[in-house]
Amino acid sequence: MFVMLISVTDKSIHGKNMNGYLKRILNARVYDVAIETPLEVAQNLSARTGNTILLKREDMQPVFSFKLRGAYNKMAQLTQEQLKRGVITASAGNHAQGVALSAQKLGCKAVIVMPTTTPQVKIEAVKHFGKRSVEIVLHGDSYNDAYDHA
């Protein structure tokens, strides 16, 4: 296992130009809703591997997961017309919470389809983060059932 950190001054990785990729990262609007989380040294894992292993503490995000970053970044790129129409997703967990918080922050309606087997704690978290922006639909016994329904 290795962790690679790329600084803004790096020009390439594995022979590929990273300027466009880094520009997209630096211009992402995720910090409208996400927090900048620290890197922490994983002492035991570093000792076992003989390398310095850093962990990105995404558990410190408002939804306790990195999934908020992708959901918000995608939704923040939608046009006003698209946001007005709303979004729909299928998820039984962290992605649902990320979409819910993103919808609430962007003033967008979101339908989140979750399997009927979703733990109540996850359903309540989605309600909490989405407030009145979210409609939860429980459908099917599995993620695939929920996905097909969405």
Q: Model-derived features: where do they sit?
A:
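PLP-dependent amino-acid enzyme catalytic core
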Residues: 3-150
